[in-house]
């Protein structure tokens, strides 16, 4: 799930549309979104060009690691193409091709670099057709694939881009199982099966370590395959594992992913779904439970969980998708903006931050796409 400053405006526009009784001037709204994107992009270019991120308050730059990897330009290029910003896209593409190198003696987090840089380069290549972007993606994929060299096939968390050395043996399902879309796409575009096979094995090995109830935990040792935290949920550290089971089936037609998704989906709905109403009225939430016993361990739901209505809609379960989206809207409307996490039984906010999460926007899009209900 990738973030950019424009997320805030998208969210505001989304809920303006949802609550409006008048026809929505779509061209006007599209122009507003594009203008906000350009505002954010120009700020980045002015104060942080050549680095990973802009710190807007101090007007300084920030790099994720010891050396910059052009996170923002790579992340934003496909958005520029989709918005028809030809000049900005051409300038950004040229800068990436001329300046981005992965031959750096730095440790990077495989999960974050995969979803942002590898995914960004692949989508930019698919939209522009420039094979130099695919060459960069393949080079990155070759450097990242060392993470899969564990005794279990579950990936280590960190890899040195230059030496291939790895570290970080305690990981989580989101990081071990959220790789197949990017690595699989790299395989399809390069014709090199190794990327697909290694990422799929990591996904399968994560699934194979589910409990007899069909649930996975929060943290796992990639060298032993033993769980170090048995809390099960759809939130941070697990969330996109479930998303990639479904989307890998839909994207690649992989029958194993279909089987794993359907079994996991049944377990999620049996042990994590919660229809108990509390002080925050709603029909459906998804809470936490112990992966081995199914015992409820927490009744929290947050901004990261709000991806799940989109997954439910994509899976064909529009009934649950609409009910859970209504819960997400309750969480949003209670304070005018969603908290990072709240207790859905008491209404107590557990984490009040708001780091511009886009998950609820994606779910709103999918629900509207399938239902046409504003």
What are the functions of these language-model segments?
Residues 2-8:
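Sec-dependent signal peptide recognition
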């Amino acid at each position: 799930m990738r973030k950019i400053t424009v997320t805030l405006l998208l969210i505001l526009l989304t809920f303006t549309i949802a609550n409006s009784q008048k026809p929505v001037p779509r061209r006007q709204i599209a122009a507003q979104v594009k203008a906000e994107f350009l505002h954010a992009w120009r700020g980045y270019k002015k104060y942080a060009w050549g680095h990973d991120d802009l710190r807007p308050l101090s007007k300084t730059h920030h790099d994720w690691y010891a050396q910059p990897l052009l996170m923002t330009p790579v992340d934003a290029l496909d958005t520029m193409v989709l918005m028809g910003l030809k000049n900005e896209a051409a300038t950004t593409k040229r800068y990436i091709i001329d300046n981005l190198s992965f031959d750096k003696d730095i440790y990077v987090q495989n999960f974050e670099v995969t979803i942002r840089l590898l995914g960004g380069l692949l989508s930019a290549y698919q939209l522009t057709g420039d094979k130099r972007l695919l060459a960069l993606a393949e080079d990155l994929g070759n450097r990242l694939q060392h993470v899969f060299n564990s005794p279990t096939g579950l990936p280590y968390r960190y890899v040195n881009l230059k030496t291939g050395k790895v570290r970080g043996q305690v990981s989580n399902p989101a990081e071990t199982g959220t790789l197949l879309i990017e690595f699989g796409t790299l395989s399809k575009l390069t014709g090199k099966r190794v990327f697909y096979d290694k990422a799929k094995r990591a996904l399968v090995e994560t699934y194979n370590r589910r409990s007899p109830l069909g649930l996975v935990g929060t943290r796992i040792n990639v060298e032993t395959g033993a769980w170090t935290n048995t809390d099960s949920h759809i939130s941070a550290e697990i969330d996109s594992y479930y998303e990639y089971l479904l989307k890998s089936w839909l994207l690649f037609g992989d029958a194993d992913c279909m089987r794993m998704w359907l079994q996991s989906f049944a377990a999620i709905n049996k042990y994590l779904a919660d229809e108990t109403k509390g002080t925050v009225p709603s029909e459906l939430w998804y809470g936490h439970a112990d992966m081995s016993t199914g015992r409820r361990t927490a009744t929290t739901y947050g901004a990261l969980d709000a991806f799940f209505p989109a997954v439910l809609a994509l899976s064909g379960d529009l009934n649950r998708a609409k009910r859970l989206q209504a819960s997400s809207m309750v969480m949003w409307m209670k304070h005018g903006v969603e908290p990072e996490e709240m207790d859905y039984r008491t209404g107590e906010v557990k984490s009040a931050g708001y780091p511009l999460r886009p998950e609820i926007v994606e779910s709103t899009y999918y629900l509207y796409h399938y239902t046409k209900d504003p």
